Amino acid sequence: MRTALPPVTAAIALLACSPSSKAASGDSAAAATASSAAATPGRAARPNDPVAASRPSADPDFHPSWSRKSVIYEVNVRQYTPEGTLAALQRHLPRLEKLGVDILWLMPVQPIGVKNRKGKLGSYYAISDYTAVNPEFGKIEDFRAFVAGAHQRGMRVILDWVANHTAYDHEWVTAHPDYYERRADGSLMNARDNEGKETDWTDVAELDFRNPALRQAMIAEMKWWIDSTGIDGFRCDVAGGVPVDFWVEARTALKVRAPALFLLAEAEDPRMHAAFDMTYGWDLHHLMNAIAQGKQGTPALDAYFARDDSVYGPGAYRMYFTSNHDENSWNGSEFERMGANHKAAFVLDATAQRSMPLLYTGQEVSMKKRLRFFEKDTVDWTGPSLADFYSSVFDLKHTQAALANGPWGGPQVKLATDGGDRVYAFTRSRDDNTVLVALNFADKPTSVSYRGLTRPGGYTEWFTKASASLATDGKIEIPANGYRVFVR
């Protein structure tokens, strides 16, 4: 049983309203690639100062202590229940607690712009008022009640924040036209990609972070949610489209209000770790899609993790996933992209060094459909349950010291095998705890010989609970499209 979190403190002052958005019309991976490190023409250059350009700090005090063994769950409020409301969502909290969720990331809950709206209901990321709740979802009191309910069950809540752009009918468009980027003819500019080109996100206008007044207004809006609702942090949409130095400024200001604040960046640029606790692992996600489909072999993982080690270092949290709202809606479910290998891929995501695994709405009931992004499309919760699998993986994460997040976990060491390019194995150790992970992405079971296990002895296979004696050199039987995880 988790310890309940402190009750939400009432707000003392309301700050000015405002909005932000992201009209997704394609895979947002493009907005999260490492190429975001390059400054784009016409926007404030991202700083190359020593703080922003250095590897993520290994200082454990950078991250809130409560996040050491956390796992994260993305909530699509609109599609979660037939009602699509926060009150209806709150009824799922007991189930999510039982599943083992630590952090609930809510997709944007603010009102959606009407001008240039996509579809009937619009994009969650086309925000017309930063400090209000979409009436389709409920009222601010419903949001506060949800946060309080989550805290009572030991879960944290972070809110999706869209600083890069707002809806075209946000009040700032008329009240503060200087907050926005402009085309050569003076007209508002759609949100841009990492190369500075306008996207087809025609329902949102790009903000100009060269303006100090905009920066202060944006931070004020974020403070409002902390003060008024007691949320625990933010997932920042298209974070790579906003200058790193703004995020550093925002983190500093927000942590005065919430010292245990948690920030997640939709970006893969390592410099984001100057301000963010966690960044997206898009590159690993795309690699795992390719491995699951047989288009790449597991040796590619060696190159990935070597690069990750050199670029991010031990202090960073990296969010790994088999699905999220962008992947599901635009590229398909994990069943489409990974087939029978989706569970083995998730085991890797949950056990790899620096990883915090993400579970998306509906994955626990084998959701195979692509949820529509701009229309109502309720999740069918009667699908085949995978709750026991995901709960077991989360319990593995929670109980094994070697798998802790960031600087608290153990280093990842590849275990040599004769399994070829469809098998991958590694160990992680911390203090007297060792975890051995062996994965088989082939469609046939395999008996793998390994060598060089540095901590031989008695182990327990996590999922079957069978005892095993593992020698320095030995064999492991792995099911087709399967996994074996041994702990001691």
Question: What annotation goes with each model-predicted range?
Answer:
Residues M1-A4:
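Positively charged n-region of N-terminal signal peptides that target proteins for export
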Residues P6-A16:
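Bacterial N-terminal signal peptides
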Residues C17-W105, P111, R144, G149-A150, ...:
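Carbohydrate-interacting/catalytic domains
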Residues G42-P56, E221, D227, D237-F321, ...:
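Active-site-proximal helices and loops of the catalytic beta/alpha 8
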Residues A53-V71, R78-A87, R91-D102, P108-T229, ...:
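Substrate-binding/active-site clefts of carbohydrate-active enzymes
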Residues V71-Y73, L104-L106, V157-L159, F234, ...:
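Hydrophobic faces of well-ordered beta-strands that scaffold small-molecule active sites
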Residues W105-G119, W161-D169, D237-P243, E266-P270, ...:
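Short, solvent-exposed turn/loop segments enriched in Gly/Ser/Thr/Pro and often Arg
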Residues P314-R337:
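Active-site clefts of carbohydrate-active enzymes
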